[in-house]
């Protein structure tokens, strides 16, 4: 039995994606530590912000009764995001981080998104410290890359010559999807340093799923199922009526007669909300789009406010922000799920994509844009009520296409200091080929034009007919899928995403520090003598992500 302590680092633990992952991950490893021959003495959540930490410790960490693991938190503002609009004392921040690290010597470090460029000082201090202290073991878990659609973040790290991905034997890189795992290896990180660690999903106890499957076909279960179905219909009707009553005066295009398509996300640019809105207007007689949360960061608030205004003006049928307190008491997510007929996503960039897994667990049909992060677990959607579409096209006048092309050229040339001329020219040619056609992939349009198209679809019958005709194959499939009962294989999902599966992989990573002779014999590296080797991984990642789908104007930081 190995005894360990874990220090879990992130910029913040505010409600959201990475926080959910961290909570589920901690619950996983506490529950299954002994099964994997580990004893966890202590886990510390270490953050740049105190907000929400007490709530996590008191209410969201689920310790088994026999667990002796101590759970606590520590806060130091040196870990927080560094704002771009003021001068900060880099030396002062560095000293604080080093003092913090000294407190947690002897712990396994589990650091999330350390390299994102949101706090470049933290990135540098982490990688320097790990290179100089080869007894300090660290799992560096990557959810997002600065090399992917974040040129300002990446440029700052690159210009400062910061090491981003050191190749040293006391580090393991954890990727949350198969594409990212593949990219890290292709970029030059040794295979045995890179591990695929899918985000854990709660509610996937294999034992309980097996028990449920055993009684599924019994007579008692059959009778109970009919009773449950009636109760579910009543609950759905009641939840839908409450939502309509609460929001019909705020959102004039909300249509009580149409289906509810749930998009359970924050309103941020990469979620490409307005494409889902377009689908809500051209699919059959239309459906209500339900978007749960606003965007909150400075970079996303403008986009969030624009989408909010589109709902309020009636450009988009449905409800926006029902999970926030903007319009009064927030509606619990369970109530919104109960009211919904299917789950929809038009996201153009995801790390994991919880909504896809959740749609199955909620027994809701799924309509989603295809993303390459799905390549590792696409088999769980086989024979389910799920439809993956590639793109939605709309007619765009030549003068607008020429204007958009220039916007792309200006945006892509921002990479000129960090990308070679050949790569820049190739990207420009690819974008030009996308925009020379009379009909254009909606997700490549700037936000202002997306809004104009939504308004035109509402007001111009001829244009609406053209858009419907262009996308008829897709909308016909959507109409079929959303009326299909959701079926899935729960045991297959559990194999990928259960707490037990996550814990087994996590502890296997920890064992690899001691068990892998190949890695144990890796030469020690030093930041000052091996700069070129350290830079090549990041440079290769930049090339892998330098593709039109990651250069969309929607992802632009300006």
Feature locations, PLM:
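C-terminal amphipathic helix plus adjacent low-complexity
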Residues: 386-558
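Aromatic "clamp/platform" in nucleotide-sugar-dependent glycosyltransferases that forms part
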Residues: 348
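Conserved donor-binding/catalytic core segment of Leloir-type glycosyltransferases
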Residues: 7, 211-216, 221, 232, ...
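A short, active-site helix/loop in glycosyltransferases that binds the activated sugar's phosphate group
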Residues: 155-193, 201-208, 512
């Amino acid at each position: 039995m190995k005894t360990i302590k874990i220090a879990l680092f992130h910029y913040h633990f505010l409600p959201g994606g990475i926080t959910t992952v961290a909570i589920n991950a901690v619950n996983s490893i506490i529950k299954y530590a002994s099964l994997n021959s580990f004893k966890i003495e202590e886990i510390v959540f270490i953050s740049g912000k105190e907000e929400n930490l007490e709530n996590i410790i008191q209410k969201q960490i689920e310790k088994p009764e026999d667990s002796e693991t101590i759970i606590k938190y520590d806060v130091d503002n040196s870990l927080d995001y560094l704002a771009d609009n003021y001068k900060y004392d880099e030396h002062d921040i560095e000293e604080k981080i080093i003092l913090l690290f000294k407190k947690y010597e002897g712990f396994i470090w589990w650091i999330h998104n350390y390299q994102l460029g949101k706090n470049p000082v933290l990135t540098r201090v982490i990688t320097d410290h790990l290179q100089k202290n080869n007894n300090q073991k660290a799992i560096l878990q990557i959810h997002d890359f600065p090399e992917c659609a974040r040129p300002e973040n990446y440029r700052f790290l690159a210009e400062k010559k910061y090491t981003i991905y050191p190749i040293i034997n006391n580090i393991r890189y954890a990727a949350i999807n198969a594409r990212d795992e593949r990219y890290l290896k292709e970029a030059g990180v040794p295979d045995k340093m890179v591990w695929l660690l899918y985000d854990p999903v709660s509610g996937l106890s294999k034992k309980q799923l097996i028990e449920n499957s055993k009684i599924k076909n019994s007579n008692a279960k059959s009778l109970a199922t009919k009773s449950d179905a009636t109760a579910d219909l009543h609950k759905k009707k009641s939840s839908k009526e409450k939502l309509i009553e609460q929001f019909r005066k705020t959102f004039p295009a909300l249509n009580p007669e149409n289906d509810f398509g749930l998009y359970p996300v924050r309103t941020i640019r990469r979620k490409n909300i307005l494409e889902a809105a377009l689908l809500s207007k051209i699919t059959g007689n239309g459906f209500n789009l339900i978007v749960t949360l606003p965007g909150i960061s400075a970079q996303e608030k403008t986009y969030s406010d624009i989408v909010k205004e589109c709902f309020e003006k009636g450009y988009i049928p449905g409800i926006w922000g029902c999970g926030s307190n903007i319009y009064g008491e927030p509606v619990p997510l369970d109530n919104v799920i109960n009211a919904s007929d299917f789950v929809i996503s038009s996201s153009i960039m995801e790390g994991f994509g919880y909504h896809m897994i959740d749609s199955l667990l909620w027994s809701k049909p799924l309509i989603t844009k295809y993303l390459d992060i799905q390549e590792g677990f696409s088999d769980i959607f086989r024979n389910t009520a799920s439809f993956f579409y590639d793109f939605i096209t709309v007619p765009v006048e030549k003068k607008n296409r020429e204007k958009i092309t220039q916007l792309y050229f200006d945006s892509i040339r921002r990479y000129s200091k960090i990308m070679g001329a050949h790569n820049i020219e190739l990207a420009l040619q690819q974008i030009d080929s996308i925009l020379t056609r009379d009909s254009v992939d909606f997700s490549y349009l700037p936000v202002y034009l997306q809004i104009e198209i939504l308004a035109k679809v509402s007001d111009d019958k001829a244009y609406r007919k053209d858009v419907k005709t262009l996308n008829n194959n897709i909308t016909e499939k959507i109409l079929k899928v959303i009326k299909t009962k959701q079926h899935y294989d729960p045991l297959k999902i559990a194999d990928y995403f259960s707490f037990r599966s996550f814990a087994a992989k996590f502890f296997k990573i920890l064992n690899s520090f001691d068990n892998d002779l190949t890695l144990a014999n890796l030469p020690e590296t030093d930041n000052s003598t091996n700069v070129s080797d350290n830079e090549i991984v990041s440079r290769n990642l930049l090339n892998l992500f330098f593709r039109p789908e990651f250069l969309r104007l929607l992802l632009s930081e300006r």
